[in-house]
A protein has these predicted regions:
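Compact, glycine-rich, soluble single-domain proteins
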Residues: 2-97
Length: 97
């Protein structure tokens, strides 16, 4: 699936990923390929991005906002204050504050 994370200042992430976990208003939930279409409000918390296992990450290009998860270097995390998620046709867009 394709993921794009956008803030008011910049595009923070734009790439193919294996999965994404987000802090929904009623708890964290995860999306994989072919997830049903959804629009959801996000609360403060961590967005967890599961990158492709064969994908080589260059963290210098990520402006220091996305950091590797402490237990798994194939998971990137991004702290958000709030946001909105739209998922449709294997494309997720996160509008993050």
């Amino acid at each position: 699936m394709f993921l794009e994370i956008v803030s008011p200042e910049a595009i923070l992430f734009s790439s193919e990923v294996d999965a994404i976990a987000v802090p929904g208003e009623h708890g964290e939930f995860q999306m994989l390929n072919n997830h049903a279409p959804i629009v959801a409000n996000l609360k403060e918390g961590l967005v967890k991005i599961h990158v492709h296992s064969q994908q080589h990450l260059v963290l210098d290009d990520l402006n220091g906002l996305l950091v590797p998860h402490v237990d798994d270097d194939k998971i990137l995390t991004l702290q958000i204050n709030s946001g909105t998620l739209e998922f449709n046709d294997n494309k997720a867009i996160v509008l993050a504050d």
